[in-house]
C-alpha cells in the first residue's frame, strides 16, 4: 500500500543520511591527515610511501593475505561502518559474485578516493582501500579514453597534439600530491615543453613526418603510475 511504501521510505532515509554523514566525517579526517603528511614528506618520500601503501592493496602482497583481508571488519559496533566494509569486500570479489555489487565509494572525487587509498590510520579496511583504488582506476580509464579520442581528432584536423598535452598537464596538476609523486620528476616540465613547441607531427620533416600519434600518446601514458588492481 501507499502508506506502507511511505513508511519503508521513512525507515531507510535515516540510515542513508547516517551513512553519508559518517563517510563525510571520515573523509574530512582523512583529508586532514593527508594534508599533514604532504607537508612533512619530500616528493621522493611521498612517492615511496605511496608505493608501499599500494602494495598493501594490490599485487602479490595483497593476494597473500586475501583471506585475512576478506574477513577484516572495522573495530566498531557502528552498523553503517560494518555494512560498508562488507559491501567493499563483496565488491572487490565481484568477479565471483555475478558482478552485481556496488562500489561503496563510487562517485567520490579523485582526491577523496586518494585520501581513502593512502590512509594508513586504520580508519578503512584493506578491502575498502582497494575498492576506493578500483574506483579511482575506473575514473582514470574513463578520462584516458576521452582524452585519447580528443587527441586523435586534434591530430587528424591539425597534425598536432598540443591541446592533448595541455589536457594531460591540467589533469596531472589536479591530482593529489601523493599521486603526482608517482610520476617522473620532470613529467610536468616535459609536457610544458611539448606545449610550448606546438609541434606539427605531420609536416615537420626533422621529427617524424606522418608519425603515428598513438605511439606518442601511449609513450606518455607509460610514464604514469600503472593501475594497481588485477582483473
Question: Each predicted region: which residue ranges?
Answer:
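Type III/flagellar secretion export determinants
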Residues: 1-231
Amino acid at each position: 500500500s501507499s502508506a506502507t511504501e511511505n513508511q519503508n521510505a521513512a525507515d531507510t532515509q535515516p540510515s542513508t543520511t547516517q551513512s553519508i554523514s559518517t563517510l563525510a566525517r571520515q573523509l574530512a579526517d582523512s583529508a586532514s591527515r593527508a594534508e599533514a603528511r604532504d607537508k612533512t614528506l619530500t616528493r621522493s618520500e611521498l612517492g615511496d610511501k605511496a608505493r608501499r601503501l599500494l602494495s598493501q592493496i594490490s599485487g602479490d602482497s595483497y593476494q597473500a593475505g586475501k583471506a585475512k583481508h576478506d574477513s577484516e571488519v572495522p573495530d566498531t559496533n557502528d552498523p553503517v561502518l560494518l555494512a560498508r566494509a562488507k559491501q567493499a569486500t563483496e565488491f572487490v570479489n565481484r568477479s565471483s559474485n555475478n558482478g552485481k555489487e556496488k562500489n561503496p565509494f563510487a562517485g567520490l572525487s579523485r582526491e577523496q578516493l586518494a585520501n581513502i587509498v593512502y590512509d594508513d590510520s586504520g580508519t578503512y579496511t584493506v578491502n575498502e582501500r582497494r575498492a576506493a583504488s578500483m574506483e579511482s582506476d575506473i575514473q582514470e580509464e574513463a578520462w584516458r579514453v576521452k582524452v585519447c579520442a580528443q587527441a586523435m581528432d586534434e591530430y587528424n584536423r591539425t597534425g598536432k597534439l598540443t591541446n592533448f598535452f595541455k589536457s594531460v598537464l591540467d589533469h596531472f596538476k589536479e591530482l593529489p600530491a601523493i599521486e603526482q609523486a608517482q610520476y617522473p620528476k620532470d613529467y610536468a616540465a616535459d609536457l610544458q615543453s611539448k606545449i610550448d613547441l606546438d609541434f606539427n607531427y605531420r609536416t615537420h620533416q626533422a621529427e617524424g613526418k606522418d608519425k603515428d600519434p598513438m605511439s606518442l600518446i601511449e609513450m606518455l601514458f607509460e610514464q604514469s603510475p600503472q593501475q594497481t588492481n588485477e582483473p
